[in-house]
Structures are given as structure tokens and as C-alpha cells.
């Protein structure tokens, strides 16, 4: 499964047993909704998830500042269509200063959009009801199309951020992002507090949609929060807005999460509606990196089944659909060209995977946005980075121990083999945009073959297997000094460079020069030479 699954934790999914079942069915990221969580829950949830699977990420969704009504006598206010209401007298907001940005003719929505008003005058500030309804204490207020200055985070958010950093969560989601400065403000606070978490911007206002191009540049990921976005926009516009947000995010290398009412019927029912399956399918085809469950997994009756449903639909769609690459990428053109080369090479040779060796994650992000047919394995020495990259479409973490600067190509291959994800003979495209990985230099793309790795050099000729010899009885001659007793061998392995005259005499043979071996090849040992990559392996019985 390439599409990732995000699930909100709540009473229905807070036990280790249920969480393990959800993870076993494909859960990649656990969401803590700070609006309904206690700050003490962060440490408890983090420890539980890490004890089950250390590759699963954790996100704290910050509530952020909200615009709401005050309280009413008796707890409610009946609204009559056509009637005028004076703000500050009939209806009070928790921040009356925001009205300075509102003009005559603007619409104001209250109670999650159920009650609509139009501004009649600003002195006194009077609004006219456009429909009947009832307002309750602290009803949500939206003012579509206007930038509303509410600040970025609250004191409560700051407390959650500090706790999240202390517990090592991986993501912070920022609510009601309207401009890039909101994201920058949160990131500054995270860095000043000692954190390096990825920032997910929730697009749920018209201002956020209008400023999406600048927001993606400041963000690591984008959440299409269709609930509030569907209040601020006419419902007919939400689907195309979703497509526009996803496309814009991918052009900048940001991952995307589609959220709200993904499988809402499964809060109470064990199976989804046909419309929900259609919605999920189209979100995947739109190139969403992840789909998010909210009430379905937090308070629903069937949290495991909801995750399983997303997995089943994702598996089917991914098997049937060819995904479009990002045709334009607004980033480092050299690194993007390397990523594109890795994708094209992988698709052409039908590789079993792309191993992207990364320190910052940028190479992995770009390759993921190109939607290669093979899975992308994010090989990194940072466990935290591995979890962050696990949210990207088609990416799986491959955590390696040690210092990146000290890892040789052979050591990297050993980690790949020990991961158990690849059988002997698997073809891998290996790429790095980072200079300290020493398997070929900066911005490199190579093909490697998985097996019992012995060494690697510069190869010419066909792939073959045979018995190694340091004398005359064997198929593959081993030479440490560049000398040979004759040319009647099928292949030659030199641990040094050789003279052009000798190379010319071996034309038509398989030759490996400057071979670097991780161990001594024994006399009579059967080995395999990959003529395309120069990799030397222990030969399996079926290799010829």
C-alpha cells in the first residue's frame, strides 16, 4: 500500500490492542486532537505507539485561536430570517476587533455555517439574517474571504508544543492557516523550543486557499480540512479546491492529507457507503499522500474496520491506476533531475525498489512526488526523519544505525539485506542527493542487486556466475596485481586498475576493475558478477 493512513486517537482506539490492529492494517500516522485531549495524554500515547511500532509517526493537531460567539441568555438565541442584529449588543464575539476587517455586503456564517448573515452597516455594526436558525453558546463564526487576525497559537497550544517536543512527536498541525507568516511563526516557536518537527498547514479558510502557493513554501505538509473549508466555500467548489491544493502542494514537494468525513458512516456502521468509496478513490487518483480518519477512529464503533477499508480501497486503486508525475517542480533543479532520473530508471528496468539515501529527506520527497511504480525506501540514520518520511506516498522507512559520514556502500547494502524486504537478485535503484554517502559521490543514481554482497567495481561485459580462481582452474580469474596467466577465462576481477593494452586484449569478456571487496573471495567459490553494476555476489544455485 502506497497511500498512507492517518487516524485520530480517542476512546475507541486508545487501547494497545486496538492500536496494534490498526497499525497492522496499514496505519502510518496517529493524530492527537488537542481540542479533545489532555496534555498528559501526549506522553502516554507516544509511549504506547512507540512500543508497538517505532516507524509510526505521531501528530499533534493544535486547536489554535478560534472566533466564536459569546454566551446567550438561556444558552440559545433564535434567529429569524430578514431580521437585523446588532453586533456587540445582540450577538457578542470573543474578539470584536476582527469586525474592523469586515465590509458592508460581506457574509458572516455562524454555527458551522448553519446560520448566515449579511453585513448591512458598520456603524452601528448590523447584520441581517439570511435564514432561520438557532445559535448556541460559543457558536463557531466564519467570515469567508476576509483575513481575520486572530494570532497563530494560544498559550494552550504552546504547552502542547513543548510537551510534544519533550516526548518526540513528529508533526504539528496548524489550524486555520491564512498566510505563510502563520506557519513561519509556529516554526520559529518550535525551533526556539528545541524541536525540529514537520509543520502541517490545515487549509480550512478561503484566505488559506487564496494564499496556498505561499503557504506550501513555508510548510512541510498540507491538510485539506474539508469540514471548515466547506463552510467557507460553496459546497460545489470544495472538490475542485481539493484538487488545486493537492497539485500546488506537490509542485513544492509537500505531502498532502485529505481529511473530514472520509468514512463518516463507519462511526456507527461496519461498512462504508458507495459515495464514500468513490470519494476515497478520487482522492487517491488526485495524488493525495494520505487519508485521515477523525470520528471514525476516535469515537466510532469500528476503528479497525475503517482503517482496513482504506487499505483495501488503496491497494485496489493503486494496482489499477497509473499515477501522474508532478510535471513541474518548484525546487532545486539539479536534485529534481536526479530524482527524476531515479524514477525513470526504476520504471524502465522494473526495479524492486528505490533506495534513497538521505540526511534531510529532500531526495525522498522529490522522488515520491514523481510517483514511481516501485516503492521508495528512505534510508537514513535518523529514526525521527524515517518516521516523518513515512507519511509520503509510496515511501517506507529504512532506519540505519551509525554515522552517515562513515557508512560505506557495502555497509548500506548489508542494512538493506538485513531488513528482510528484498530477496536475493532483487534489483534496486539507489540514489543520494547528499555528499557524505560514499557509494559514488554526490547526486548519484546507480543500480544494485541484492544478494550476499562481496564487493563492487567498474564492470564491462555480461552478467554471469562461475567459480573463482587465483590460478588456472576456474571460470573467473582473481588478480590483485593486474597480471593474468592467460585470457581463457569467462571473466576477470581486478582489485586494481589495469593497463589499456590488457583491457583491449580482454574485449568480449566480463571484466571488473578497481574491485573493492568486503572479504576475500575463496578459491573455487561460486560468485556472481552483475555486468551492469559491477556488483559481486555469492552465486545462488539458479544463477548461470
From Swiss-Prot:
Chain positions of site Transition state stabilizer: 202
Tree of life domain: Archaea
Cofactor(s), by name: Mg(2+); K(+)
Pathway: Carbohydrate degradation; glycolysis; pyruvate from D-glyceraldehyde 3-phosphate: step 5/5
Entry's EC annotation: 2.7.1.40
A Pfam entry, by short name: PK
Residues binding ATP: 33-36, 68
GO molecular function: ATP binding; kinase activity; magnesium ion binding; potassium ion binding; pyruvate kinase activity
Subunit field text: Homotetramer.
Protein name, as recorded: Pyruvate kinase
Amino acid at each position: 500500500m502506497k497511500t498512507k493512513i492517518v487516524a485520530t486517537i480517542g476512546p475507541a482506539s486508545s487501547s494497545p490492542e486496538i492500536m496494534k490492529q490498526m497499525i497492522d492494517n496499514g496505519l502510518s500516522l496517529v493524530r492527537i486532537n488537542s481540542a479533545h485531549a489532555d496534555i498528559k495524554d501526549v506522553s502516554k500515547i507516544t509511549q504506547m505507539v512507540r512500543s508497538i511500532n517505532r516507524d509510526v509517526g505521531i501528530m499533534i493537531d493544535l486547536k489554535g485561536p478560534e472566533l466564536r460567539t459569546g454566551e446567550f441568555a438561556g444558552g440559545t438565541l433564535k434567529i429569524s430570517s430578514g431580521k437585523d442584529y446588532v453586533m456587540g449588543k445582540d450577538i457578542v464575539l470573543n474578539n470584536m476587533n476582527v469586525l474592523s476587517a469586515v465590509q458592508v455586503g460581506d457574509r458572516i456564517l455562524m454555527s458551522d455555517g448553519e446560520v448566515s448573515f449579511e453585513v448591512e452597516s458598520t456603524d452601528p455594526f448590523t447584520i441581517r439574517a439570511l435564514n432561520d436558525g438557532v445559535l448556541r453558546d460559543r457558536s463557531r463564526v466564519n467570515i469567508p474571504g476576509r483575513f481575520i487576525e486572530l494570532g497563530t497559537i494560544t498559550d494552550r497550544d504552546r504547552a502542547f508544543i513543548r510537551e510534544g517536543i519533550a516526548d518526540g512527536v513528529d508533526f504539528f498541525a496548524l489550524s486555520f492557516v491564512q498566510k505563510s507568516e502563520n506557519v513561519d511563526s509556529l516554526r520559529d516557536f518550535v525551533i526556539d523550543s528545541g524541536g525540529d518537527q514537520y509543520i502541517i498547514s490545515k487549509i480550512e479558510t478561503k484566505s488559506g486557499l487564496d494564499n496556498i502557493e505561499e503557504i506550501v513554501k513555508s510548510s512541510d505538509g498540507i491538510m485539506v480540512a474539508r469540514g471548515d473549508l466547506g463552510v467557507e466555500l460553496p459546497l460545489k467548489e470544495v472538490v475542485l479546491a481539493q484538487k488545486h491544493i493537492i497539485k500546488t502542494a506537490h509542485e513544492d514537494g509537500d505531502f498532502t492529507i485529505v481529511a473530514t468525513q472520509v468514512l463518516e458512516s463507519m462511526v456507527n456502521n461496519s461498512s462504508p457507503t458507495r459515495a464514500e468509496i468513490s470519494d476515497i478513490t478520487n482522492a487517491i487518483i488526485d495524488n493525495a499522500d494520505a487519508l485521515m480518519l477523525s470520528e471514525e477512529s476516535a469515537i466510532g464503533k469500528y476503528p479497525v474496520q475503517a482503517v482496513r477499508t482504506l487499505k483495501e480501497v488503496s491497494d485496489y486503486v493503486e494496482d489499477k491506476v497509473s499515477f501522474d508525475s508532478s510535471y513541474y517542480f518548484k525546487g532545486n533543479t539539479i536534485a529534481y533531475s536526479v530524482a527524476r532520473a531515479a524514477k525513470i530508471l526504476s520504471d524502465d528496468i522494473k526495479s524492486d525498489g528505490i533506495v534513497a539515501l538521505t540526511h534531510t529527506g529532500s531526495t525522498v520527497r522529490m522522488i515520491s512526488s514523481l510517483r514511481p511504480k516501485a516503492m521508495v525506501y528512505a534510508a537514513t540514520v535518523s529514526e525521527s526523519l524515517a518516521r516523518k518520511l513515512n507519511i509520503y506516498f509510496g515511501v517506507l522507512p529504512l532506519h540505519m544505525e551509525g554515522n552517515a559520514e562513515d557508512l560505506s556502500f557495502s555497509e548500506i547494502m548489508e542494512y538493506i539485506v538485513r531488513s528482510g524486504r528484498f530477496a536475493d537478485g532483487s534489483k534496486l535503484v539507489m540514489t543520494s542527493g547528499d555528499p557524505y554517502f560514499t557509494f559514488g559521490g554526490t547526486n548519484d543514481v546507480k543500480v544494485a542487486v541484492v544478494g550476499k554482497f562481496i564487493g563492487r567495481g567498474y564492470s564491462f561485459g555480461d552478467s554471469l556466475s562461475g567459480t573463482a580462481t587465483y590460478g588456472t582452474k576456474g571460470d573467473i580469474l582473481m588478480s590483485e596485481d593486474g597480471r593474468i596467466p592467460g585470457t581463457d577465462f569467462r571473466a576477470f576481477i581486478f582489485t586494481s586498475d589495469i593497463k589499456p593494452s590488457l583491457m583491449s586484449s580482454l574485449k568480449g569478456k566480463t571484466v571488473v576493475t578497481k574491485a573493492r571487496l568486503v572479504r576475500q573471495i575463496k578459491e573455487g567459490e561460486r560468485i556472481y558478477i552483475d555486468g551492469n553494476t559491477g556488483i559481486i555476489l555469492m552465486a545462488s544455485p539458479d544463477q548461470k
